[in-house]
């Protein structure tokens, strides 16, 4: 057992059991959790940092402020594309990105499978998360 009183180790069995194939086709998560490379590149997900995915490069902190990147036409265009039927998260991206659980929850909410509810407890669920 790896967990103790200070650290809780949680195996993400759902990621293992689904063999890396997400249940969703549209990629909603990046709007809530962008990724930034060490060079300042802002992309919807780390898997898109490579130059061959330059059409997904939203901006770069070296050249512009986050506020300007966030309010840019590029940001809107890329986020709308990822959430559209033209993008298939099951075939057009890498295996289970950091935004996986956000995308999964939003997909279930939009489809009416499981609505997202406000938290009832004021204590954050992940106050010890690393």
Protein language model regions, located:
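Short, compositionally biased leader-like segments
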Residues: 1-14, 120-121, 125-127
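Short, small/polar residue-rich loop motifs at catalytic or cofactor-binding pockets
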Residues: 26-30
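Flexible mid-to-C-terminal extensions adjoining Fe-S/redox cofactors in radical SAM and related proteins
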Residues: 47-130
């Amino acid at each position: 057992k790896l967990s103790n009183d200070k650290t809780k180790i949680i195996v993400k069995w759902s990621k293992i059991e689904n063999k890396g194939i997400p249940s969703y086709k549209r990629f909603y998560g990046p709007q809530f959790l962008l990724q930034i490379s060490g060079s300042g590149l802002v992309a919807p997900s780390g898997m898109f940092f490579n130059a061959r995915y330059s059409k997904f490069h939203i901006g770069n902190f070296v050249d512009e402020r986050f506020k300007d990147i966030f309010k840019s036409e590029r940001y809107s265009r890329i986020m709308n594309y990822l959430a559209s039927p033209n993008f298939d998260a099951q075939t057009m991206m890498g295996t289970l990105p950091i935004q996986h659980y956000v995308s999964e929850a939003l997909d279930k909410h939009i489809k009416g499978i499981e609505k997202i509810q406000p938290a009832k407890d004021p204590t954050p669920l992940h106050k010890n998360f690393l």
